[in-house]
Amino acid sequence: CLEIAFDENLNVLIGDNEAGKSTILSAIDIVLSGSRNKVEMYGLQSLFNKEIIDEFLNSSKEITNLPKLEVELYLNDQNNMNLEGNYNSLQESGHGLLLTCEYREDLTKEINEILNQEEANFPFEYYSIDFKTFSGESYTGYRKYISHLFLDNTQINSEYATRKYIKTMYQAN
């Protein structure tokens, strides 16, 4: 579990390469966007902690011990009742958004077949991707609660990416 308290005015993330700075920003972007496509673009295998996956694969591989990914964004009061509630890990009233990725219980039989194989396969494709507000209401990329802009200069490497970047800039204003 990683918890980061941000200042409301300015925050600077400093660290060595591969320390997780971009991962933190990407997680925030994914939750704010409510986009399943973004999750699939990154791939669940890159969002989960590699050590947690390896630890599971080296264990007895019980389906009930499959890791679960949760990203919670606690927000200041947004004057939006849809964001307010206690549907969060602390079960405390607040404003926020939540991404949950967990194995689908309706696919237990198929998942067990994969886990019982000799080779170390993790069943990422049998995970659900769920976006909810702290009120427990589902949301998607079509119903964004907060406008945001995520600039990643490593992705601006083509004419298409540049046009998309400029379009996003104008939409944020």
Residue ranges: model-predicted function:
Residues C1-S33, Y42-I53:
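Pre-Walker A-like glycine/lysine-rich segment at the N-terminus of P-loop NTPase domains
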Residues E8, P67, F124:
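Structured loop/turn residues at beta-strand edges in well-structured enzyme cores
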Residues N37-V39:
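Beta-strand-rich, non-transmembrane domain signature
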Residues L47-F56, K109-I114:
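Short mixed-charge
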Residues N49-I52, P67-V71, H95:
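Short beta-strand or tight-loop elements
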Residues D54-S59, N82-N86:
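Short structured motifs
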Residues N58-L66:
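Intrinsically disordered, low-complexity, mixed-charge
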Residues E70, N76-N173:
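Electropositive, glycine-dotted interaction segments
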